[in-house]
A protein has these predicted regions:
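Catalytic cores of TIM-barrel enzymes
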Residues: 1-167
Length: 167
């Protein structure tokens, strides 16, 4: 019988897996990476500001946290001036901050699973968190060049995060 990792590799290369892949079973998700912009919100708790400056709240009776996009909390109020509003979170953390993550990563059986840093949000989510979903979608149509610049900026940040994780 193949390991979870081997089975997924067989699926990816069009080989001969010995069973259906069960979603994320081949991945050991590593949470709590120091340079992650994500900040945990608690159902019914106080609003929390993430590394991008986005304030999120998780009201009781809802399926999860979502950004506050009122005038007080919206990070990027004008896509044509996004550089004035949007500041990427820091990525440079000392080795000591990585110690727990390194130890948890070393404990993963790499024959059985892939080690994967769990980072959220992604590109689109970051855009709509910063702009509000309505403004984000409108700006894709009305200001595609500015949206492309913002996406490049977010991508550069995510690449810097990836470099930190791989180091």
């Amino acid at each position: 019988m193949l390991t979870k990792r081997q089975n997924l590799i067989e699926v990816m290369k069009g080989g001969s897996p010995d069973r259906f892949v069960n979603q994320y079973e081949a991945f050991a998700l590593i949470m709590g990476v120091p340079c992650s912009p994500f900040k945990q919100t608690i159902c019914g708790g106080e609003p929390v500001k993430d590394g991008w400056g986005v304030t999120k709240v998780w009201p009781v009776g809802t399926p999860g946290a979502f950004p506050l996009h009122d005038d007080e909390h919206l990070v990027c109020k004008d896509i044509t001036r996004w550089r004035d509003y949007v500041k990427a979170p820091r990525v440079d953390y000392p080795d000591l901050a990585w110690e727990d993550v390194v130890n948890r990563t070393k404990a993963i059986n790499r024959e059985e699973q892939f080690a994967i840093a769990f980072l959220t949000p992604g590109l689109f989510e970051t855009c709509h968190n910063l702009l509000g979903i309505q403004n984000c979608l409108i700006n894709f149509y009305q200001e595609p060049e500015r949206m492309h610049e913002l996406i490049d900026y977010i991508t550069d940040y995510q690449m810097a995060v990836a470099e930190q994780i791989c180091d």
